């Protein structure tokens, strides 16, 4: 792991800079900010490095007086944490701390950033927008190498394991939501792991096609920092704005999935899934998933061999494994309670048969899950250690 390059002088200058910024940098006893502070975490020390300038410009365009917008960016030039503010020359990102070269795909780095904002900007609620590469619960590395452990962010090939990401969200910090501007993060495995860390997650079952949420920053920051409406209403509004934007695009760019998950409902959903499938008893002796299941990844598009789907629609798979019809109504209710909003285009990257290995979207429950298969014995073994597996596979008598 790369070492932090913070010096005592840099720390002193950072503290001085913070004192000059004002705004949120007050004592804990003072009144919290009128708007919800938003932390934008950009892990860009990878092939996303070219996104920094355009994203920073979009964030500046979306900032309004009274907003507490904190931006962490890790680029090949080094990492830093800044706070957006107005200057005589216009809106600018004031550097609060410089870190030099470091690994942003580290739970320790994410936790340090969140704790810094929590300390400098006391509030009774925060939001986190996380932008990077991601592969959901899948093993670290690439989609083409199914081995290792669950991953979220990417930095020069390093990735944050899912458990490390969850643990990096500080206990006690009132993190109202996480918005994943990342690929393949709306997995049941991910949401169960985040239960107890943040109550709401906005994420995509499929990949997020560039430029992602960037076109929404100018108008969307108002929504993400608002306090007057309930959090799920705000996130659904942000999500719907994104989907409306995508619906207005053409060709392969008209591709998106998005869902809003109540993480506190995930344990009940896992139990309902276990009961309705009798612990997925149907999986015994089966090497491949049932044919025709809706999936949200693009097998073969990542250099993966063998090329096989790994992100299936949760509802579609449960229906294929239905073992207790009397428990079906409870499952439907638990799913509706967990997924409070969802939307998707009719096809992704051109749909079935496209040169981009896209797919049609006939089903979209808002959650995905992995289905064990014979081609991936190491991946199957890793999957058996996830909280989702353990919560759903015990046989029901």
Q: PLM ranges: what are they?
A:
Residues 20-23:
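C-terminal motif of bacterial Sec signal peptides marking the signal peptidase cleavage site
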Residues 29-31, 115, 136, 143-397:
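Terminal, contiguous helix-loop blocks that mediate binding/assembly
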Residues 44-45, 72-78, 133-134, 182-184, ...:
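Short beta-alpha junction loops
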Residues 25-122, 383-384, 389:
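N-terminal extension/subdomain marker
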Residues 34-37, 65-69, 121-127, 172-177, ...:
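Loop/turn elements at helix/coil->beta-strand transitions in domains of secreted/extracellular proteins
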Residues 72-95, 130-156:
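Surface-exposed loop and adjacent secondary-structure segments within mature catalytic domains
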Residues 2-13:
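Bacterial N-terminal signal peptides that target proteins for export
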């Amino acid at each position: 792991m790369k070492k932090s390059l913070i010096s005592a002088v840099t720390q002193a200058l950072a503290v001085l800079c913070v004192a000059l910024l004002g705004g949120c940098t007050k004592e804990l006893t003072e009144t919290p900010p009128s708007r919800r502070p938003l932390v934008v975490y950009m892990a860009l020390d990878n092939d996303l490095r070219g996104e920094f300038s355009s994203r920073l410009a979009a964030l500046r365009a979306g900032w309004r007086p009274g907003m507490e917008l904190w931006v962490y960016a890790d680029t090949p030039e080094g990492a830093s944490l800044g706070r957006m503010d107005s200057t005589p020359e216009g809106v600018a990102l004031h550097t609060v701390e410089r870190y030099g070269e470091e690994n942003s795909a580290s739970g320790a780095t994410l936790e340090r950033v969140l704790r810094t904002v929590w300390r400098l900007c006391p509030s009774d609620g925060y939001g986190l927008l996380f932008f990077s590469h991601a592969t959901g619960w899948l093993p670290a590395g690439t989609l083409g190498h199914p081995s290792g452990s669950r991953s979220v962010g990417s930095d020069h090939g390093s990735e944050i394991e899912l458990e490390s990401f969850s643990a990096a969200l500080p206990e006690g910090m009132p993190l109202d939501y996480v918005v994943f501007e990342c690929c393949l993060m709306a997995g049941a495995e991910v949401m169960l792991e985040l239960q107890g860390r943040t109550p709401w997650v906005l994420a995509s079952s499929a990949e997020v096609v560039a430029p992602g949420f960037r076109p929404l920053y100018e108008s969307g920051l108002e929504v993400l920092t608002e306090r007057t409406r309930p959090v799920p209403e705000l996130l659904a509004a942000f999500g719907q704005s994104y989907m409306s934007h995508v619906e207005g695009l053409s060709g392969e760019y008209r591709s998106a999935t998005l869902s809003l998950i109540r993480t506190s409902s995930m344990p009940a959903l896992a139990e309902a899934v276990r009961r309705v499938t009798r612990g997925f008893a149907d999986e015994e002796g089966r090497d491949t998933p049932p044919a025709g299941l809706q999936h949200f990844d693009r097998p073969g598009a990542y250099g993966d061999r063998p090329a096989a789907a790994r992100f299936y629609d949760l509802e579609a798979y449960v229906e294929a494994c239905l073992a207790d019809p009397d428990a079906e109504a409870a499952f439907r209710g638990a799913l509706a309670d967990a997924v409070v909003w969802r939307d998707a285009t009719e096809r992704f990257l051109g749909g079935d048969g496209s040169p981009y290995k896209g797919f049609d979207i006939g089903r979209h429950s808002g959650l995905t899950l992995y289905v064990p298969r014979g081609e991936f014995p190491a991946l199957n073994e890793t999957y058996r250690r996830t909280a989702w597996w353990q919560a759903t596979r015990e046989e029901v008598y």
